Amino acid sequence: MGLYDRDYARGNSYAYETTSRSDSQIISFVKETYKLFAASMLAGAAGAYVGVPMAGTIHAMFLPLMLLEIGLLIGLHFVKHKPGINLMVMFSFVFMTGLMLAPLLARTLGMSGGGTIIGNAFAMTSVVFGAMSFYAIKTTTDFTSYTKPLMIALLVVVGFSIVNMFLGNPMLSVIISGAVVMLFSILVIYDTQNIMQGAYETPIDGAIALYLDFLNIFTALLQLFGIFGNNDD
């Protein structure tokens, strides 16, 4: 799940806050970041499209595929300055996140009105992401200083998510999904401001941060809409 990968890019944001960049360099950095983010969205969608027909196989191989996904993310950290290879690893990772989302998508499609549920979740995610991005640009509040409380909140959510993997409590699932939506909505603001300040080391760092924000919000909303929108007994 993207939730467990979210630390990747944030670690670089405050490590490079003091990097001196001119206004023109920051503008170029922002443009490149959002181009990569858009391309990542397409690659993730391609992974999901390929994965849905073989959702059962992906579910059965969840652990090795998850380890591969994490391995690609870690590997990206070491090759992000190597042209060509960095993009290949980045898109491989993003494609894998789409594959890993396929079982949830397939399960939702199997519900009554499943296609509508997925469409609504994506539309709501886009609205939330766009609104938070706009707010990040317009607000005078500096969310980049909230690294520590956001990290603590993330660890708490991850901890409860792991616990609920064993408990399988539906009510706790709802609470966790709601918390994920709220937390990653704030992280959209946090990451957007870091990108606008040129705080990330590379555009790939910023693009992956935004992509994981979007992915986690979408996944959480899809789970919530699936729970409340499933009328099958």
Regions found by a protein language model. Name each.
Residues 1-233:
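A hydrophobic alpha-helical transmembrane-helix feature that marks the membrane cores
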